[in-house]
Amino acid sequence: MGNLLKIENINYSLEDLDNSVRKWNISANGKFLLRYPTVYIINDKKSENNFEVYVGETADIRNRTRQHLNADTKVKSFWEDFSESKKSSMYVIGHELFNKSLTLDIENRLMQYLLSVENISRVHNSRTNQQNEYYTSEMLDEIFSEICLLYTSDA
């Protein structure tokens, strides 16, 4: 299943977002990041072994990230901290089987998992979105395990 999963890590800034979107627009698997629902993790390295993270899902990663960087910084201080930090990055996770329900379940599982990680001092998104059955629900465990393997090997 590995070729179905796409994870990109970019610096958390408008400039890097725009550069990445241009690259994804011409890549073979870019549609899984730009035109499919995605899950994303924004992390900020506070010290050598201390991170704060935000886990989200969206149907439009470009516009959602712009909202976080431009408008949300005026509403919640942690968004300003993420945007001003030179150590913030964002993992964008796409998959050809992602639909809204599956991304909500992946987001929920990632929040639960990251809350248990010793080096993560804060997970800022605390809403839960557990879904009932849906078309690809039987793939949740396998896709989540693959994401965790790739994310933890890169983080």
Predicted region positions:
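Long, charge-rich alpha-helical interaction segments
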Residues: 137-150
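Conserved short loop/helix modules at catalytic or binding sites
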Residues: 61-109, 113
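N-terminal, Lys/Arg-enriched amphipathic/low-complexity engagement segments
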Residues: 4-26
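Conserved small/polar residues in nucleotide/adenosyl-binding loops
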Residues: 151-155
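A short catalytic or substrate-binding loop motif that flags glycine-/basic-rich loops and adjacent residues
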Residues: 30-36, 46-48
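GIY-YIG nuclease signature motif recognition
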Residues: 40-42, 51-59
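Conserved aromatic-histidine-acidic binding/catalytic patches
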Residues: 53, 94-102, 132-135, 139
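Domain-level recognition of nuclease-like catalytic cores that cleave nucleotide substrates
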Residues: 102-128, 135
